[in-house]
Amino acid sequence: MVKVGVNGFGRIGRLVTRAAFNSGKVDIVAINDPFIDLHYMVYMFQYDSTHGKFNGTVKAENGKLVINGKAITIFQERDPANIKWGDAGAEYVVESTGVFTTMEKAGAHLKGGAKRVIISAPSADAPMFVMGVNHEKYNNTLKIVSNASCTTNCLAPLAKVIHDHFGIVEGLMTTVHAITATQKTVDGPSGKLWRDGRGAAQNIIPASTGAAKAVGKVIPELNGKLTGMAFRVPTPNVSVVDLTCRLEKPAKYDEIKKVVKQASEGPLKGILGYTEDQVVSCDFNSDTHSSTFDAGAGIALNDHFVKLISWYDNEFGYSNRVVDLMVHMASKE
Protein backbone atom coordinates (compact mmCIF):
# COMPACT_ATOMS: atom_id res chain seq x y z
CA MET A 1 0.00 0.00 0.00
CA VAL A 2 1.39 3.40 -0.98
CA LYS A 3 2.48 5.63 1.90
CA VAL A 4 1.06 9.14 1.71
CA GLY A 5 1.73 12.54 3.24
CA VAL A 6 -0.89 15.30 3.27
CA ASN A 7 0.13 18.95 3.02
CA GLY A 8 -2.64 21.27 4.23
CA PHE A 9 -5.26 19.93 6.63
CA GLY A 10 -8.20 21.95 5.28
CA ARG A 11 -11.47 20.63 3.82
CA ILE A 12 -9.77 18.48 1.16
CA GLY A 13 -6.79 17.46 3.31
CA ARG A 14 -9.07 16.20 6.06
CA LEU A 15 -11.48 14.49 3.68
CA VAL A 16 -8.71 12.80 1.69
CA THR A 17 -7.55 11.47 5.06
CA ARG A 18 -11.09 10.28 5.83
CA ALA A 19 -11.41 8.72 2.38
CA ALA A 20 -8.07 6.94 2.89
CA PHE A 21 -9.19 5.45 6.21
CA ASN A 22 -12.66 4.58 4.92
CA SER A 23 -11.32 2.81 1.84
CA GLY A 24 -8.13 1.31 3.27
CA LYS A 25 -6.58 1.87 -0.17
CA VAL A 26 -3.66 4.10 0.86
CA ASP A 27 -1.66 4.56 4.04
CA ILE A 28 -1.55 8.10 5.52
CA VAL A 29 1.79 8.41 7.36
CA ALA A 30 2.30 12.18 7.73
CA ILE A 31 0.41 15.48 7.76
CA ASN A 32 1.86 18.99 7.50
CA ASP A 33 -0.01 22.14 8.46
CA PRO A 34 1.72 25.16 10.01
CA PHE A 35 -1.57 26.71 11.13
CA ILE A 36 -3.14 23.78 13.00
CA ASP A 37 -1.46 22.21 16.03
CA LEU A 38 -1.81 18.54 16.94
CA HIS A 39 -4.66 18.86 19.44
CA TYR A 40 -6.59 21.10 17.09
CA MET A 41 -6.08 18.49 14.33
CA VAL A 42 -7.72 15.88 16.55
CA TYR A 43 -10.75 18.13 17.00
CA MET A 44 -10.99 19.19 13.34
CA PHE A 45 -10.70 15.63 12.11
CA GLN A 46 -13.22 14.24 14.58
CA TYR A 47 -15.98 16.81 14.10
CA ASP A 48 -17.30 17.89 10.71
CA SER A 49 -20.35 20.12 10.24
CA THR A 50 -20.98 18.78 6.76
CA HIS A 51 -20.12 15.08 6.87
CA GLY A 52 -20.71 14.39 10.56
CA LYS A 53 -18.47 12.96 13.25
CA PHE A 54 -15.62 10.66 12.17
CA ASN A 55 -16.72 7.04 12.46
CA GLY A 56 -13.64 5.82 14.31
CA THR A 57 -11.13 6.88 16.93
CA VAL A 58 -8.83 9.88 16.83
CA LYS A 59 -6.45 11.13 19.53
CA ALA A 60 -3.08 12.75 20.16
CA GLU A 61 -0.37 10.48 21.54
CA ASN A 62 3.40 10.96 21.88
CA GLY A 63 3.30 13.97 19.57
CA LYS A 64 1.49 12.07 16.81
CA LEU A 65 -2.05 12.05 15.46
CA VAL A 66 -3.48 8.58 16.05
CA ILE A 67 -6.44 7.61 13.84
CA ASN A 68 -8.01 4.17 14.34
CA GLY A 69 -4.86 3.15 16.21
CA LYS A 70 -2.52 4.29 13.43
CA ALA A 71 0.13 6.87 14.40
CA ILE A 72 0.67 9.71 11.91
CA THR A 73 3.69 12.01 12.00
CA ILE A 74 2.83 15.71 12.26
CA PHE A 75 4.87 18.56 10.76
CA GLN A 76 4.28 22.30 11.05
CA GLU A 77 6.46 23.71 8.27
CA ARG A 78 5.52 26.77 6.23
CA ASP A 79 8.04 26.01 3.47
CA PRO A 80 7.26 22.74 1.64
CA ALA A 81 10.98 22.23 0.94
CA ASN A 82 11.58 21.81 4.69
CA ILE A 83 9.07 19.02 5.30
CA LYS A 84 10.93 15.77 5.97
CA TRP A 85 8.51 13.51 4.10
CA GLY A 86 11.22 10.92 3.54
CA ASP A 87 11.89 10.56 7.27
CA ALA A 88 8.18 9.90 7.86
CA GLY A 89 8.14 7.30 5.07
CA ALA A 90 5.81 9.28 2.79
CA GLU A 91 6.28 8.35 -0.88
CA TYR A 92 3.41 10.40 -2.33
CA VAL A 93 2.31 13.83 -1.13
CA VAL A 94 -1.18 15.26 -1.54
CA GLU A 95 -0.68 19.00 -2.01
CA SER A 96 -3.95 20.35 -0.64
CA THR A 97 -3.10 23.83 0.62
CA GLY A 98 -4.45 25.42 -2.55
CA VAL A 99 -1.24 27.49 -2.64
CA PHE A 100 1.47 25.35 -4.25
CA THR A 101 -0.35 24.43 -7.46
CA THR A 102 2.41 24.82 -10.06
CA MET A 103 5.11 22.30 -11.00
CA GLU A 104 7.77 24.53 -9.47
CA LYS A 105 5.99 25.18 -6.18
CA ALA A 106 4.67 21.63 -5.71
CA GLY A 107 8.11 20.33 -6.70
CA ALA A 108 9.46 21.59 -3.36
CA HIS A 109 8.00 18.46 -1.74
CA LEU A 110 10.47 16.32 -3.69
CA LYS A 111 13.32 17.99 -1.81
CA GLY A 112 12.08 16.50 1.46
CA GLY A 113 12.09 12.97 0.09
CA ALA A 114 8.67 12.60 -1.53
CA LYS A 115 8.71 10.62 -4.79
CA ARG A 116 5.55 12.07 -6.32
CA VAL A 117 3.14 14.94 -5.71
CA ILE A 118 -0.61 14.99 -6.38
CA ILE A 119 -2.02 18.52 -6.50
CA SER A 120 -5.65 18.51 -5.31
CA ALA A 121 -6.56 21.45 -7.53
CA PRO A 122 -6.28 22.48 -11.17
CA SER A 123 -2.74 23.39 -12.19
CA ALA A 124 -1.46 25.83 -14.79
CA ASP A 125 1.34 23.49 -15.88
CA ALA A 126 1.13 20.07 -14.19
CA PRO A 127 -0.49 17.28 -16.22
CA MET A 128 -4.12 16.82 -15.13
CA PHE A 129 -5.79 13.46 -14.66
CA VAL A 130 -9.46 12.65 -14.19
CA MET A 131 -10.23 9.12 -13.06
CA GLY A 132 -12.35 7.26 -15.61
CA VAL A 133 -11.46 9.74 -18.34
CA ASN A 134 -7.72 9.95 -18.97
CA HIS A 135 -6.06 8.21 -16.00
CA GLU A 136 -4.71 5.54 -18.37
CA LYS A 137 -2.45 8.20 -19.92
CA TYR A 138 -0.49 8.47 -16.67
CA ASN A 139 3.02 7.04 -16.81
CA ASN A 140 5.61 6.77 -14.06
CA THR A 141 7.98 9.35 -15.54
CA LEU A 142 5.59 12.00 -14.16
CA LYS A 143 6.57 13.17 -10.70
CA ILE A 144 3.99 15.95 -10.27
CA VAL A 145 0.36 15.60 -11.36
CA SER A 146 -2.94 17.37 -10.75
CA ASN A 147 -6.27 15.70 -9.96
CA ALA A 148 -7.98 18.68 -11.70
CA SER A 149 -10.98 20.30 -9.98
CA CYS A 150 -14.12 18.83 -8.43
CA THR A 151 -16.17 20.37 -11.25
CA THR A 152 -13.92 18.98 -13.99
CA ASN A 153 -14.25 15.58 -12.30
CA CYS A 154 -18.03 15.92 -12.51
CA LEU A 155 -18.20 17.24 -16.07
CA ALA A 156 -15.51 15.18 -17.82
CA PRO A 157 -16.95 11.65 -17.29
CA LEU A 158 -20.35 12.82 -18.54
CA ALA A 159 -18.85 14.71 -21.48
CA LYS A 160 -16.76 11.65 -22.38
CA VAL A 161 -19.79 9.34 -22.50
CA ILE A 162 -21.83 11.82 -24.55
CA HIS A 163 -18.95 12.60 -26.91
CA ASP A 164 -18.03 8.93 -27.43
CA HIS A 165 -21.59 8.05 -28.41
CA PHE A 166 -23.02 11.13 -30.10
CA GLY A 167 -20.20 13.63 -30.59
CA ILE A 168 -20.24 17.04 -28.91
CA VAL A 169 -20.07 19.88 -31.44
CA GLU A 170 -19.91 22.55 -28.73
CA GLY A 171 -21.22 23.10 -25.24
CA LEU A 172 -21.65 25.53 -22.37
CA MET A 173 -21.50 24.45 -18.75
CA THR A 174 -22.92 26.12 -15.69
CA THR A 175 -22.11 24.78 -12.26
CA VAL A 176 -24.40 25.76 -9.43
CA HIS A 177 -21.74 25.50 -6.76
CA ALA A 178 -21.79 25.30 -2.98
CA ILE A 179 -19.83 27.72 -0.81
CA THR A 180 -16.10 27.06 -0.38
CA ALA A 181 -13.45 28.42 1.98
CA THR A 182 -12.25 31.10 -0.46
CA GLN A 183 -15.53 33.01 -0.08
CA LYS A 184 -16.48 35.63 2.54
CA THR A 185 -19.07 35.10 5.28
CA VAL A 186 -20.14 38.76 4.94
CA ASP A 187 -19.19 41.39 2.35
CA GLY A 188 -15.44 41.90 2.29
CA PRO A 189 -12.56 42.82 0.01
CA SER A 190 -11.74 40.52 -2.89
CA GLY A 191 -8.78 41.64 -4.96
CA LYS A 192 -9.33 40.60 -8.55
CA LEU A 193 -13.04 39.87 -8.75
CA TRP A 194 -15.17 42.19 -6.67
CA ARG A 195 -18.28 40.01 -6.69
CA ASP A 196 -16.36 37.12 -5.11
CA GLY A 197 -16.07 39.17 -1.93
CA ARG A 198 -19.82 39.45 -1.37
CA GLY A 199 -21.46 37.58 1.52
CA ALA A 200 -21.60 33.88 0.67
CA ALA A 201 -24.63 33.05 2.80
CA GLN A 202 -26.87 35.76 1.35
CA ASN A 203 -26.13 35.85 -2.38
CA ILE A 204 -26.15 33.96 -5.64
CA ILE A 205 -22.75 35.00 -6.98
CA PRO A 206 -21.80 34.64 -10.67
CA ALA A 207 -18.20 33.45 -10.78
CA SER A 208 -15.61 32.15 -13.18
CA THR A 209 -14.46 28.54 -13.44
CA GLY A 210 -11.82 26.93 -15.60
CA ALA A 211 -13.50 23.54 -15.21
CA ALA A 212 -15.09 23.31 -18.66
CA LYS A 213 -11.99 24.46 -20.52
CA ALA A 214 -9.96 21.97 -18.46
CA VAL A 215 -12.07 19.16 -19.94
CA GLY A 216 -10.28 19.99 -23.20
CA LYS A 217 -7.00 19.11 -21.50
CA VAL A 218 -8.19 15.68 -20.33
CA ILE A 219 -10.26 14.96 -23.48
CA PRO A 220 -8.18 16.55 -26.28
CA GLU A 221 -10.95 16.08 -28.90
CA LEU A 222 -13.08 18.51 -26.90
CA ASN A 223 -10.41 21.19 -26.71
CA GLY A 224 -11.98 24.55 -27.60
CA LYS A 225 -15.48 23.08 -27.68
CA LEU A 226 -16.51 23.68 -24.06
CA THR A 227 -16.46 26.65 -21.72
CA GLY A 228 -18.44 27.53 -18.65
CA MET A 229 -19.17 29.62 -15.59
CA ALA A 230 -20.35 29.16 -12.02
CA PHE A 231 -23.03 30.44 -9.70
CA ARG A 232 -21.93 30.27 -6.08
CA VAL A 233 -25.05 29.62 -3.97
CA PRO A 234 -25.66 29.60 -0.19
CA THR A 235 -25.42 25.85 0.46
CA PRO A 236 -22.55 24.29 2.44
CA ASN A 237 -21.80 21.37 0.11
CA VAL A 238 -22.91 19.51 -3.05
CA SER A 239 -22.94 21.18 -6.44
CA VAL A 240 -24.59 20.46 -9.77
CA VAL A 241 -23.37 20.73 -13.35
CA ASP A 242 -25.68 21.85 -16.14
CA LEU A 243 -24.16 20.93 -19.51
CA THR A 244 -25.97 22.35 -22.52
CA CYS A 245 -24.54 20.96 -25.72
CA ARG A 246 -25.07 20.50 -29.42
CA LEU A 247 -24.75 16.91 -30.61
CA GLU A 248 -23.18 15.78 -33.86
CA LYS A 249 -25.39 12.68 -34.22
CA PRO A 250 -29.11 12.97 -33.50
CA ALA A 251 -30.20 11.38 -30.22
CA LYS A 252 -33.49 11.01 -28.40
CA TYR A 253 -33.24 11.89 -24.70
CA ASP A 254 -34.06 8.28 -23.81
CA GLU A 255 -31.03 7.11 -25.83
CA ILE A 256 -28.83 9.50 -23.88
CA LYS A 257 -30.21 8.14 -20.60
CA LYS A 258 -29.51 4.61 -21.78
CA VAL A 259 -25.84 5.14 -22.66
CA VAL A 260 -25.16 7.05 -19.43
CA LYS A 261 -26.83 4.30 -17.39
CA GLN A 262 -24.74 1.66 -19.17
CA ALA A 263 -21.53 3.59 -18.49
CA SER A 264 -22.50 4.00 -14.83
CA GLU A 265 -22.90 0.24 -14.46
CA GLY A 266 -19.85 -0.63 -16.55
CA PRO A 267 -16.56 1.17 -17.26
CA LEU A 268 -17.38 4.20 -15.08
CA LYS A 269 -18.90 2.33 -12.12
CA GLY A 270 -18.17 4.19 -8.90
CA ILE A 271 -17.19 7.33 -10.82
CA LEU A 272 -20.32 8.22 -12.79
CA GLY A 273 -23.61 7.48 -11.06
CA TYR A 274 -27.13 7.45 -12.51
CA THR A 275 -30.47 8.19 -10.89
CA GLU A 276 -34.08 8.52 -11.96
CA ASP A 277 -35.20 9.52 -8.45
CA GLN A 278 -36.59 12.96 -7.55
CA VAL A 279 -33.37 13.99 -5.80
CA VAL A 280 -32.15 17.31 -4.39
CA SER A 281 -28.69 18.46 -3.37
CA CYS A 282 -28.71 17.11 0.21
CA ASP A 283 -29.23 13.60 -1.16
CA PHE A 284 -25.63 13.65 -2.41
CA ASN A 285 -23.93 14.77 0.78
CA SER A 286 -21.01 12.36 1.43
CA ASP A 287 -21.59 10.63 -1.93
CA THR A 288 -18.35 9.18 -3.30
CA HIS A 289 -19.10 9.43 -7.04
CA SER A 290 -17.40 12.11 -9.15
CA SER A 291 -20.70 12.74 -10.89
CA THR A 292 -24.28 11.43 -10.72
CA PHE A 293 -26.45 11.94 -13.81
CA ASP A 294 -29.95 13.14 -12.96
CA ALA A 295 -32.05 11.53 -15.69
CA GLY A 296 -35.25 13.28 -14.68
CA ALA A 297 -33.82 16.79 -14.57
CA GLY A 298 -32.40 17.04 -18.09
CA ILE A 299 -34.28 18.34 -21.13
CA ALA A 300 -33.98 18.13 -24.90
CA LEU A 301 -35.00 20.94 -27.26
CA ASN A 302 -34.56 18.62 -30.23
CA ASP A 303 -32.41 15.63 -31.25
CA HIS A 304 -29.29 17.78 -31.49
CA PHE A 305 -29.59 20.17 -28.56
CA VAL A 306 -29.79 19.01 -24.95
CA LYS A 307 -29.33 20.13 -21.36
CA LEU A 308 -27.85 17.46 -19.08
CA ILE A 309 -27.73 17.63 -15.29
CA SER A 310 -25.22 15.91 -13.01
CA TRP A 311 -24.70 16.19 -9.24
CA TYR A 312 -21.49 15.96 -7.21
CA ASP A 313 -20.35 16.17 -3.63
CA ASN A 314 -17.63 18.70 -4.43
CA GLU A 315 -15.73 17.83 -1.24
CA PHE A 316 -16.03 14.11 -0.67
CA GLY A 317 -16.45 12.75 -4.20
CA TYR A 318 -13.33 14.65 -5.21
CA SER A 319 -11.35 13.51 -2.16
CA ASN A 320 -12.12 9.90 -3.01
CA ARG A 321 -10.77 10.45 -6.53
CA VAL A 322 -7.51 11.81 -5.11
CA VAL A 323 -7.15 8.47 -3.29
CA ASP A 324 -8.08 6.51 -6.43
CA LEU A 325 -5.54 8.41 -8.53
CA MET A 326 -2.79 7.58 -6.03
CA VAL A 327 -3.77 3.91 -6.10
CA HIS A 328 -3.61 3.98 -9.90
CA MET A 329 -0.20 5.71 -9.86
CA ALA A 330 1.13 3.18 -7.34
CA SER A 331 0.10 0.36 -9.68
CA LYS A 332 2.49 1.80 -12.29
CA GLU A 333 5.60 1.92 -10.06
Curated annotation (Swiss-Prot):
Pathway: Carbohydrate degradation; glycolysis; pyruvate from D-glyceraldehyde 3-phosphate: step 1/5
Subcellular location: Cytoplasm, Cytosol; Cytoplasm, Cytoskeleton; Nucleus
Residue numbers of Deamidated asparagine PTMs: 7, 62, 68, 147, 153, 223, 314
Activity regulation behaviour: Glyceraldehyde-3-phosphate dehydrogenase activity is inhibited by fumarate, via the formation of S-(2-succinyl)cysteine residues.
Main location: cytoplasm
PANTHER family in the record: GLYCERALDEHYDE 3-PHOSPHATE DEHYDROGENASE, GLYCERALDEHYDE-3-PHOSPHATE DEHYDROGENASE
Family per similarity comment: Belongs to the glyceraldehyde-3-phosphate dehydrogenase family.
Name of the protein: Glyceraldehyde-3-phosphate dehydrogenase
Organism, scientific name: Bos taurus (Bovine)
